[in-house]
Amino acid sequence: MMVKELEEVVVRFSGDSGDGMQLAGNIFSNVSATVGNDICTFPDYPADIRAPQGSLTGVSGFQVHIGAGQVYTPGDRCHVLVAMNPSALKTQIKFCKPQGLIITDSDSFEARDLEKAQFKTDNPFEELGIKQEVLEVPISSMCKESLKDSELD
């Protein structure tokens, strides 16, 4: 993967409500601001108080617009969409630019997860007609592995 330096970028984190999307977005935003970037954020909470895990109505999001210069809005469509599960991908893809990058937690794209998101096939990217670059990363496994020697799980 090629590294590109950009004047500005919009990143949208999305996943189940309660899974830490606001926390992840806030940490990412704070780090970005600490290294000298200007930021503007927008948390996106679902209407459901506590929707069933993996459901379409329970997707929570956090968008951050990062810029080398002044940033005045959280941005319209994102350059990077982080989708922690199929429901997040399905409900949030509309916010991703056509030339954007989609990062998914491949650990959360099993048959039962796709069923909860009401996909009809086992290929959500094809079913949604996704043309953006997709980076499938085993995020959950990586987190568990990094915590294996701690008392956290």
What does each of the following model-derived ranges do?
Residues 1-153:
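Active-site cofactor/cluster-binding pocket
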